[in-house]
């Protein structure tokens, strides 16, 4: 059985390891059992995959997205949906009380009410995703921009009032005001089209997040005519300054979560030690899918 866009041949994997392209036989970009486990694939998802494709001695190929489908189906009703900011920029609510902390009731999994709720701290200073703000937005951009009102997920409506920039013109802080009558998503007085997620700046925790992609170039195929591999230079992106909900401080190796609007992630079982938290992407949403999850 041949899985598209991955390296399966033992001698090719050995070369990737020897050349330092991957960090071992359990590198999450590979499809060994140890690699799949480290990336977050469950035994149930692998069994589902085998059941779907069938076991055959005949040579055949299966698209990698089939494996991703199986892990999504397995996890979607099992794991908590948490807020994590992968590329943070500070958001200050200028009219919010300075030292106030509110705890918002948030469903652990909107599709599985039996998983209950949790309390998420909300403060004057938050972090949001940098891509959720634009100074000069295109048409049909419904997230944050000057003068626009958006919903902070499970919290309040806020309206952007301005930005701070450094000497190079980079945005360092976004300012907004909030409407205290719009708390918790139950407000029906007016509608907004954009919803973005957030994490408290003072209560959030820091973590490293690793985003994995196909180790080979999807357009060119796995192998060249001479037998060499078309390595994707962007198969791993390491994000060092991510800010996550404080509850994730209790996460343990191989715990799995859905990061709202980003995808499914697993605590690395090799590099997460003590106070160092490392999350590996198991399944990333496309930008369209992320907007659908908002």
Where are these regions (language model features)?
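C-terminal, non-catalytic macromolecule-binding modules
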Residues: 156-227, 231
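Alpha-helical recognition segments enriched in aromatics with Gly/Pro capping
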Residues: 1-55, 267
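Conserved small/polar residues in nucleotide/adenosyl-binding loops
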Residues: 285-290
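Short coil-to-beta-strand transition motifs
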Residues: 151-159, 259-263
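A conserved acidic, glycine/proline-rich C-terminal tail/linker
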Residues: 238-256
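Active-site-proximal acidic segments at structured loop/helix or strand boundaries
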Residues: 52, 56-144
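Beta-rich accessory regions
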Residues: 163-172, 180, 261, 268-275, ...
């Amino acid at each position: 059985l041949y899985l598209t866009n991955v390296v399966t041949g033992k001698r090719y994997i050995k070369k990737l390891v020897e050349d330092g392209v991957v960090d071992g036989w359990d590198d999450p970009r590979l499809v060994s059992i140890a690699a799949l486990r480290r990336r977050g694939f469950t035994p149930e998802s692998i069994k589902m995959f085998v059941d779907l494709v069938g076991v055959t001695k005949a040579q055949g190929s299966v698209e990698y997205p089939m494996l991703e489908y199986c892990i999504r189906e397995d996890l979607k009703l099992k794991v908590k949906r948490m807020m994590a900011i992968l590329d943070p920029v500070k958001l200050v609510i200028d009219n919010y009380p300075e030292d106030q902390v509110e705890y918002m009731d948030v469903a652990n999994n909107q599709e599985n009410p039996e998983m209950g709720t949790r309390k998420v701290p909300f403060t004057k200073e938050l972090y949001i995703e940098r891509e959720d703000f634009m100074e000069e937005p295109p048409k049909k951009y419904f997230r944050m921009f000057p003068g626009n009102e958006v919903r902070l997920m499970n919290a309040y409506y806020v309206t952007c009032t301005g930005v701070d920039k450094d000497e190079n013109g980079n945005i360092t802080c976004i300012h907004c005001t909030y409407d205290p009558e719009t708390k918790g998503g139950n407000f029906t007085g007016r509608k907004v089209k954009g919803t973005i997620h957030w994490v408290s700046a003072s209560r959030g925790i820091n973590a490293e997040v690793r985003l994995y992609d196909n180790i080979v170039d999807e357009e060119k195929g796995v192998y060249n005519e001479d037998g060499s591999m078309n390595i994707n230079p962007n198969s791993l992106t390491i994000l060092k300054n991510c800010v996550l909900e404080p509850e994730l401080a209790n996460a343990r190796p191989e715990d799995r979560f859905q990061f709202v609007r980003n995808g499914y992630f697993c605590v690395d079982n090799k590099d997460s030690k003590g106070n160092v938290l490392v999350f590996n992407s198991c399944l990333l949403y496309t930008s369209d899918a992320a907007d659908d999850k908002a």
